[in-house]
């Protein structure tokens, strides 16, 4: 199973990009041993539409164009569920075992994701009740994906 993170906005060169890349590389190395076929990050430009409704719609169209058929979609949302790391690992492991071709994680722009993208998601995931910058959310997500891999592998990184 392939994992894809589709994110509106780009991480500029610097410590945030380096940390995100470190977690992506760690998961790729570990994931191959667990039956995962990689972790891709798709960065999409932020909409320049004048109003929030237009920005959300433009970004939703761009995101939807990158979601493969039969993917398990996870939408990051401040109104989502707070899952613990073990639960996220169970979802990824189950999808892998059920031969789901890929899991796609969606990170919207500053105005959030469209209602339609939220509806098609199997899971709406939040990282607490706080509002996070999109750059930090991407790092948190990549760390949690790596942590899920370590849980599935029985690796001591996760000490719950």
From Swiss-Prot:
**Where does it live in the cell?**
Cytoplasm
Quote the record's binding site residues for S-adenosyl-L-methionine.
Answer: 76, 108
Q: Main localisation, per the record? A: cytoplasm
The alphabetized UniProt keywords are: Cytoplasm, Methyltransferase, rRNA processing, S-adenosyl-L-methionine, Transferase
Q: Which domain of life is it from?
A: Bacteria
Q: Which Pfam families match?
A: SPOUT_MTase
Q: What is its EC number?
A: 2.1.1.177
Single GO MF annotation: rRNA (pseudouridine-N3-)-methyltransferase activity
Where is it found, in Gene Ontology cellular component terms? cytoplasm
Q: Which reactions fall under this protein's catalytic activity?
A: pseudouridine(1915) in 23S rRNA + S-adenosyl-L-methionine = N(3)-methylpseudouridine(1915) in 23S rRNA + S-adenosyl-L-homocysteine + H(+)
Q: What does the UniProt record say this protein does?
A: Specifically methylates the pseudouridine at position 1915 (m3Psi1915) in 23S rRNA.
Say which family it is in. Answer: Belongs to the RNA methyltransferase RlmH family.
The entry describes its oligomerization and partners as:
Homodimer.
The name on file for this protein is Ribosomal RNA large subunit methyltransferase H
Native species:
Afipia carboxidovorans (strain ATCC 49405 / DSM 1227 / KCTC 32145 / OM5) (Oligotropha carboxidovorans)
């Amino acid at each position: 199973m392939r994992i894809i993170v589709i994110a509106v906005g780009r991480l500029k060169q610097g410590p945030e990009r380096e940390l995100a890349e470190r977690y992506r590389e760690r998961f790729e190395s570990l994931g191959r041993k667990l039956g995962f076929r990689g972790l891709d990050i798709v960065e999409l430009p932020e909409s320049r539409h004048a109003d929030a409704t237009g920005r959300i719609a433009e970004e939703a169209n761009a995101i939807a164009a990158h979601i493969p058929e039969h993917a398990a979609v996870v939408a990051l949302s401040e109104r989502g569920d707070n899952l613990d790391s073990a639960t996220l690992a169970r979802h990824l492991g189950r999808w892998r075992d059920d031969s789901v071709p890929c899991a796609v994680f969606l990170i919207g722009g500053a105005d959030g994701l469209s209602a339609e993208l939220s509806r098609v998601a199997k899971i709406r995931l939040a990282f607490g009740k706080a509002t996070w910058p999109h750059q930090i959310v991407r790092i948190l997500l990549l760390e949690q994906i790596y942590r899920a891999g370590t849980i599935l592998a029985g690796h001591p990184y996760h000490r719950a």
